[in-house]
Amino acid sequence: MDVLLANPRGFCAGVDRAIEIVKRAIETLGAPIYVRHEVVHNRFVVDDLKQRGAIFVEELDEVPDNNTVIFSAHGVSQAVRQEAERRGLKVFDATCPLVTKVHFEVARHCRAGRDVVLIGHAGHPEVEGTMGQWNREAGTGQIYLVEDVEQVATLQINQPENFAYTTQTTLSVDDTRGIIDALRERFPAMQGPKNDDICYATQNRQDAVRDLAKRCDLVLVVGSPNSSNSNRLSELARREGVESYLIDGAHEIDPAWVAGKQHIGVTAGASAPQVLVDGVLARLAELGATGVGELDGEPESMVFALPKELRLRLVD
């Protein structure tokens, strides 16, 4: 039995930036630092930041006045930003810049009076933040959420000749393409972004899993259950005809999964750290894996800047 690693896998530039913002805010300002929502969807990362002095909350009313709060990588609505300003909270914004790009698109369409269809998963914090960019006082249009092709068939849009679509950044590329095609068939005048809203890291990791699935008879995806992009990776592997499981770490591997397997693929969602992958490799070695290889993959060199106030580290 051998192991093949997907490439790329694990942290993306937006996740790296978000985690570093929390660490440096604690380092610079001292604990505790409040973070609205899990800064990224990974249990190991969140627990580590809690130990450093981060306090995770779901709503701003859990943050004492005049304290510091960090917005998660998933972004927040304009209402949340306004509440933070009203209450005098110091804000560090860890929203992924690629999510912010989608926010700007929605706001621009709103000002232009267009209707907007957001393709995404209801209840996901990124979707809530993006829907919350819509200012009903600034435009005459409406915003609609579509989750699947079936919903397109019954979608009623006020301005079918004057609307655009945007998407959540962590969706299945294949599923999203199907929804866009269905929308365009029903509404030929639909406008879209110049470039896909699904982020480069999501695309690259899905391409890598597709390659992995061709060579393996089992694919393990390291990521937490609430991670959208990690779930999409495991779903994609299964869609490609390969047995696949989403695991938070090595402790969740069932020995029965690997029994009789020849080639085991391992990847990690964009919010899962390499240390968890290392643990999975060690556990697979205990279960009989004798070699580890790595696929060639799309190089990633993107780096997102930190807030100016956090760019210089304190020196002990």
From Swiss-Prot:
Its cofactor is [4Fe-4S] cluster. Pathway: Isoprenoid biosynthesis; dimethylallyl diphosphate biosynthesis; dimethylallyl diphosphate from (2E)-4-hydroxy-3-methylbutenyl diphosphate: step 1/1; Isoprenoid biosynthesis; isopentenyl diphosphate biosynthesis via DXP pathway; isopentenyl diphosphate from 1-deoxy-D-xylulose 5-phosphate: step 6/6. (2E)-4-hydroxy-3-methylbut-2-enyl diphosphate binds at H41, H74, H124, T169, S227, S228, N229, S271. Dimethylallyl diphosphate binds at H41, H74, H124, S227, S228, N229, S271. It catalyses: isopentenyl diphosphate + 2 oxidized [2Fe-2S]-[ferredoxin] + H2O = (2E)-4-hydroxy-3-methylbut-2-enyl diphosphate + 2 reduced [2Fe-2S]-[ferredoxin] + 2 H(+); dimethylallyl diphosphate + 2 oxidized [2Fe-2S]-[ferredoxin] + H2O = (2E)-4-hydroxy-3-methylbut-2-enyl diphosphate + 2 reduced [2Fe-2S]-[ferredoxin] + 2 H(+). It holds the Pfam family LYTB. Its EC number is 1.17.7.4. The active site is at E126 (proton donor). [4Fe-4S] cluster binds at C12, C96, C199. Keywords: 4Fe-4S, Iron, Iron-sulfur, Isoprene biosynthesis, Metal-binding, Oxidoreductase. Isopentenyl diphosphate binds at H41, H74, H124, S227, S228, N229, S271. Catalyzes the conversion of 1-hydroxy-2-methyl-2-(E)-butenyl 4-diphosphate (HMBPP) into a mixture of isopentenyl diphosphate (IPP) and dimethylallyl diphosphate (DMAPP). Acts in the terminal step of the DOXP/MEP pathway for isoprenoid precursor biosynthesis. Belongs to the IspH family. This is 4-hydroxy-3-methylbut-2-enyl diphosphate reductase. It comes from Stenotrophomonas maltophilia (strain K279a).
